[in-house]
Amino acid sequence: MAEKQTAKRNRREEILQSLALMLESSDGSQRITTAKLAASVGVSEAALYRHFPSKTRMFDSLIEFIEDSLITRINLILKDEKDTSTRLRLIVLLILGFGERNPGLTRILTGHALMFEQDRLQGRINQLFERIEAQLRQVLREKRMREGEGYTTDKNLLASQLLAFCEGMLSRFVRSEFKYRPTDDFDARWPLIAAQLQ
């Protein structure tokens, strides 16, 4: 019984990895059909549906992975780091680095892979970015409490500016077919971003 469940879990993971790889390839800029995905995995479409009731559910699983990866790591940064500037830098670098290491998933983060899918999926990505923006706002607000001096610019504006930078770099990565890595020149870019945080 345990072997059967392990085999099923492994097949599910194989399906999700194949979908992520297809999103990373030139297929990712077009609608991915279950027929193409089944061929990529080496199973029938019926076999896909034994593991996932729909393609939407496959995307849901990838989005869950993205959410868990980013939110868990952001929480670790907030737990381990106390300096506001360091926290912000590491969160931004985390988002950019995650996108760079997972190009197929970056197509989901930017919405490109979801254009042909259910609107609900884009809503989940929107909620993820709202959660991240809320965490950035909280970090910005806590500066006064932690360091005795706060920012003079509206925290909402600063948080949205940081997130817009991340989204822009991820979009550029996708648009360039993954040539322009989001973390390229980050050490030179960050002082420009940090200078806006006043």
Curated annotation (Swiss-Prot):
Under the heading PROSITE patterns, the entry gives:
HTH_TETR_1 (PS01081), HTH_TETR_2 (PS50977)
Quote any Pfam family the record assigns: TetR_N
Q: What does the sequence similarity comment in the record state about its family?
A: Belongs to the nucleoid occlusion factor SlmA family.
Its job = Required for nucleoid occlusion (NO) phenomenon, which prevents Z-ring formation and cell division over the nucleoid. Acts as a DNA-associated cell division inhibitor that binds simultaneously chromosomal DNA and FtsZ, and disrupts the assembly of FtsZ polymers. SlmA-DNA-binding sequences (SBS) are dispersed on non-Ter regions of the chromosome, preventing FtsZ polymerization at these regions.
Keywords assigned: Cell cycle, Cell division, Coiled coil, Cytoplasm, DNA-binding
DNA-binding residues per UniProt? 33-52
**Name this protein carries in UniProt:** Nucleoid occlusion factor SlmA
Q: Where is the HTH tetR-type domain?
A: 10-70
Q: What's an example of a GO molecular-function annotation for this chain?
A: DNA-binding transcription factor activity
User: Which top-level group of life is the source organism from?
Assistant: Bacteria
Q: Which gene encodes it?
A: slmA
The annotated subunit structure for this chain is: Homodimer. Interacts with FtsZ.
**Keyword Glycoprotein part of the UniProt annotation:** no
